């Protein structure tokens, strides 16, 4: 129904090709964080007729709003993993100077918020420090019990990890700890856990954002989402 391609940048004199963008296959979560699709974007006329064309109230990010409305109606979103679009850079373009159209980023935020409203997801969209990136705060429709299952062999580490979760913003938690890293034991803990959601974490986790559980629980309340994880950064 719709498809998009990879792209790069081209100099104003058409001599230099640089900054290729090799995009992933369709990711609705990534699209709500950044308009990674941009160019080329191709849609069936029937999709465009149903969803409508570009809208003036989204000037600066009218393509972002248009893409959202098209993918909402599409049964399949395709990705051609070849650089088929060359975005010309000049001083007045976003390609050459991201700060040249600051209003575009507010329009982008509005496009994401409107998408959430159309598909029935309760969320607030915020700007991130880097221009063109957005963060979604999912509203908690309810606060289900989350069973935090800490696995490992070091009692001190598990105790420290347990204390972190007791101090977090999300209070409806049930903390369970294994006596080792045996798969059967961890599965047994999961079976007897009382929570609607299970959060598996290693004793080696050294820090957790205050709202980590709330953020992930919010994502899990979205229809068709069955599992979620945050980014884990190791020392090596």
Regions found by a protein language model. Name each.
Residues 163-172:
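Short, acidic, metal-binding catalytic loop of nucleotide-sugar glycosyltransferases
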Residues 1-17, 205-236:
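Conserved donor NDP-sugar-binding/catalytic core segment of glycosyltransferases
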Residues 194-208:
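Short beta-strand-to-loop acidic/aromatic patch adjacent to the donor-nucleotide binding site
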Residues 58, 68-86, 113-125:
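Catalytic donor-sugar/metal-binding loop of nucleotide-sugar-dependent glycosyltransferases
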Residues 183-197:
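Active-site nucleotide-sugar/metal-binding loop of Leloir-type enzymes
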Residues 10, 16-42, 46:
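A recurrent flexible, glycine/aromatic-enriched loop bordering the glycosyltransferase active site
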Residues 22, 92-164:
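Non-catalytic membrane-proximal stalk/linker segments that position and tether the catalytic domains
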Residues 52-68, 100-103:
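Donor nucleotide-sugar recognition loop
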């Amino acid at each position: 129904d719709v498809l998009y391609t990879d792209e790069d940048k081209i100099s104003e004199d058409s001599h230099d090709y640089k900054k290729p963008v090799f995009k992933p296959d369709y990711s609705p979560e990534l699209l709500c964080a950044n308009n990674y699709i941009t160019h080329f974007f191709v849609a069936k006329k029937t999709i465009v007729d149903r969803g409508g064309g570009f809208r003036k109230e989204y000037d600066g990010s009218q393509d972002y709003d248009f893409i959202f409305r098209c993918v909402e109606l599409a049964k399949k979103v395709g990705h051609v993993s070849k650089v088929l679009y060359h975005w010309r850079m000049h001083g007045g373009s976003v390609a050459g100077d991201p700060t040249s159209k600051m209003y575009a980023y507010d329009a982008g935020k509005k496009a994401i918020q409107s998408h959430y409203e159309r598909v029935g997801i309760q969320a607030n969209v915020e700007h991130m420090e880097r221009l063109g990136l957005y963060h979604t705060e999912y509203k908690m429709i309810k606060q289900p019990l989350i069973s935090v299952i800490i696995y490992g062999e070091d009692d001190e580490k598990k105790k420290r990890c347990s204390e972190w979760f007791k101090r977090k913003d999300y209070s409806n938690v049930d903390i369970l700890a294994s006596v080792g890293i045996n798969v059967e034991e961890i599965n047994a803990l999961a079976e007897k856990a009382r929570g609607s959601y299970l959060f598996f974490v290693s004793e080696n986790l050294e820090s957790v954002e205050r709202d980590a559980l709330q953020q992930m629980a919010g994502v899990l309340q979205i229809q068709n989402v069955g599992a979620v994880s945050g980014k884990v950064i190791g020392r090596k």
